[in-house]
Design a protein with these regions (language model features):
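Acidic, metal/ion-coordinating pockets
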Residues: 1-239
Length: 239
């Protein structure tokens, strides 16, 4: 059996920076859950501030500090999803500093890359002969607002392409999980928009085994369709 813990949106700014400076670990009570999981997956929405300025097209912007990113080790994060609407907030230098920290601390990331096509690559987990793949996408309705001439490459959600990815992987792994930053038309809403259930069911029909959604910053309902779970939004983990 493979145990994967999915947590919601992560933004280690403001109060988390203060707590880190005070030497406080606000996640200690979750340690027994997160450190007993084989893998922990979260949507990382805060980039480290860089030297190139900020994405003036985007409001609000999220940011953190390198020191505060150390909290990711306190939650045993295995994989950071970067396909989200805050990935451009601190331009290329902020992206580089953030992903360099992840690499140095052996935290994998998917959904975005700098100047190359690695943003398209899924993440693979395997334990006891069970193979799991996770694919990460962001929908345009979440308003990422990419700056002009930016070299950050992001895995945007296009249903036809996602279905192609599912079918390409279907016979190579045991479980396909879609990790979706979506539902921008109802950000802050308690329910998915009218299109999301239709899309989610089509993706299950195409061969996905589980859909994990985020972006709304609220916990939204889930459904079981043909025996497969669709979680429309996990809400915030720390924000």
């Amino acid at each position: 059996m493979v145990r994967i813990s999915f947590i919601g949106d992560i933004s280690l700014n403001d109060n988390y920076i203060k707590l880190r400076n005070q030497g406080i670990n606000p996640f200690e009570s979750l340690r027994h859950i997160l450190f007993s999981s084989d893998f922990v997956v979260g949507n990382l929405e805060c980039m480290v501030k860089g030297n190139q300025g900020v994405n003036e097209k985007k409001r609000p912007r999220l940011e953190t500090k390198i020191e505060t990113l150390n909290y990711l080790k306190n939650i045993n994060l295995s994989l950071a999803g970067l396909a989200n609407n805050h990935i451009y907030d601190h331009l290329e230098d902020g992206f580089y500093r953030t992903t360099n920290f992840l690499k140095e601390n052996k935290i994998a990331f998917i959904g975005a890359s700098l100047k190359n096509d690695e943003y398209k690559n899924p993440a693979y987990f395997e334990k006891d002969g069970i193979k799991v793949v996770i694919l990460n996408y962001v929908s345009l309705d979440t308003n990422p607002y990419p700056p002009k001439e930016i070299n950050i490459r992001v895995n945007y959600f296009k249903e036809e392409k996602v279905i192609e990815d599912i079918k390409r992987l279907r016979n190579k792994v045991d479980h396909i999980i879609l990790y979706l930053h979506w539902g921008g038309r109802l950000e802050g809403g308690l329910y998915p928009d009218f299109e999301q259930p239709k899309i989610g069911r089509r993706l299950i029909d195409a061969g996905a085994d589980l859909i994990i959604g985020h972006h709304s910053h609220t916990v939204q309902p889930f459904e079981i369709y043909k025996g497969k779970y669709i979680f429309y939004s996990l809400g915030n983990f720390c924000f």
